[in-house]
Amino acid sequence: MNYQPIVIIGAPRSGTNMLRDVLCQFQKVGTWPCDEINYIWRHGNVGSETDEFSVDMARPKVKEFIRKEFDNFASDNDLNFLVEKTCANSLRIPFVDQVIPEAKYIFIVRDGVDVVGSAAIRWKAKLDLSYIVKKIRYVPLL
């Protein structure tokens, strides 16, 4: 691995996007051009009813697929640091650590009342098709 994975852990609407965007202002630091890569993380576990994954769900083929996605993205974009901030990872930190043990973690905490207020505004917002199109590019084919 010729790059350092950085995983931001935080609840939705807690500032993970803002932190990721600030970090990605530095040279050779980047991230996927979509908000989250939950479908990449769910590869091989699509049938799971929740985003909470145990360590034993990080089977060899699952780890290989996810690591390859990280490696390819970092290589294709000539990155020294690859920042990832899928909020669902807050429910599966041991799984993430099993897949990418060399990752460095940044934990972000925001007052729950503020998170709820921000989430309510987001939930009531109009559907953003350009946002959805960006995410679709990183949904693995079954």
Positions of PLM-derived features:
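PAPS-dependent sulfotransferase catalytic core
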Residues: M1-D76, K126-L129, V133-P140
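Glycine-rich phosphate-binding loop used to anchor ATP phosphates in small-molecule kinases
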Residues: F70-F95
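Short coil/turn segments at beta-strand junctions that form active-site/ligand-binding loops
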Residues: Y3-Q4, D78-N80, E102-K104
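PAPS-dependent sulfotransferase catalytic domain
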Residues: G44-V46, C87-L142
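Short beta-strand segments
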Residues: I8-G10, P33, L82-K85, F107-V109
